[in-house]
Amino acid sequence: LLVRKDYLETLMRFKDKQLIKVVTGIRRCGKSTLFDLFINHLESNGVSKKNIIKINFESPDYFELQDWLSVYKYIKEKLSSDSMNYIFLDEIQNVPDFQKAVDGLFIMKNCDIYITGSNAYLLSGELATLLSGRYVEIKMQPLSFKEYLSAYDDKSDLPSKYRKYIQFGSFPYILQLSEEKDIRSYLEGIYNTVVLKDIVARRKIADVGMLEKVIRFMFDNIGNPTSATNIANTMTSTRQKISYHTVENYLSALLDSFIFYKAERYDVKGKQYLSTNAKYYLCDIGLRYYLLGTKPADFGHILENIVFLELLRRGNEVYVGKVDDSEIDFVAIYNGEKTYYQVAYTVIDSDNSEKTLTRELKPLKSIKDNINVIDNHNNTF
């Protein structure tokens, strides 16, 4: 098993704390494997197997657990009364009223509860109300490049590995596949499961074809300012009529399934959050390759996407910065401290001028905060 060190250490820190541990993230990003790693850790530190209860609600072994009461009774019968029980509930969100079972177990003093979900619905509505202040969310993503590299004994030829990471993506199981056709089939399976199971079925979307057209548009416009209005207008102009409200519903579903993340805009000088022209970033660049194939990519926006995901991994709130008429790619806020990032594939112009560099630095120089600028190509300036 590929050890997801940061996530594993987070679970260890919250072990035996009177909080429900909720691991969220897109399908196949490694949530179930994280549970297996943590269970191995528990057992190697003296926890008996009889004190560990794990249920994967997508396994046929547990299909008879169709409602919250049967789940509650099943687990309660297996609890050890004289010691702590570690309960792992994998993809429980499809059990109607599952929050009642979770709440019933939580009030017992000898239950340490861990749950996963592949849809933001898990923490919406009634569950969020019922468990308010009693859970911690651990937001999981596919592999960072650092985690991806950890799977290789040979750490040489980083450019080649990085190109593969960008092209085929960062889902952990990709590392087990060597043939491109197998990788594409695997990505197709993830895409279809997320779209058909987590979006179409849950949102009861009738026009799947139109949904896929919107998804294609989004995949092709990562890092561009986007709104439901401009998507609807763009598609209507090409005789694919769709309403603003339908696009809004689709975008909400894409965010809920964790296939996209949204970066709202922030006025740096006015110190206020803006509600228009947010940017959307993919959870995994490999999915773009699967859907759009060899269509030319804007590598600047792909690099932007990777930086955005890394900032999220490090616990930042991430916004797109506005400074007068200029833009800062990212305003990252961590513990109240702001850091500003400009991301460029290169700042070297073909005529050896510094126009691109000047343009990228202009909004940063207008901010009163101290700025450190790192250039990946020339180390630093």
Regions found by a protein language model. Give the residues of each.
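A cross-kingdom feature that marks ATP-driven nucleic-acid transaction machinery
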Residues: 1, 18, 24, 33, ...
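Pre-Walker A adenine-sensing motif
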Residues: 2-16
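Conserved glycine(s) of the Walker
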Residues: 30
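Short glycine-rich substrate-engagement loop in P-loop NTPases that contacts/grips substrate
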Residues: 53-85
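Conserved P-loop NTPase "ATPase switch" module shared by AAA+ and STAND
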Residues: 80-98
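Structural recognition of the conserved hydrophobic beta-strand(s) that form the central parallel beta-sheet
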Residues: 88, 112-118, 139
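Short regulatory helix/loop adjacent to the ATP-binding pocket of P-loop NTPases
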Residues: 104, 121-137, 151-153
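Interdomain hinge/linker elements that couple catalytic modules in large macromolecular machines
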Residues: 142, 146-303, 309, 317-318
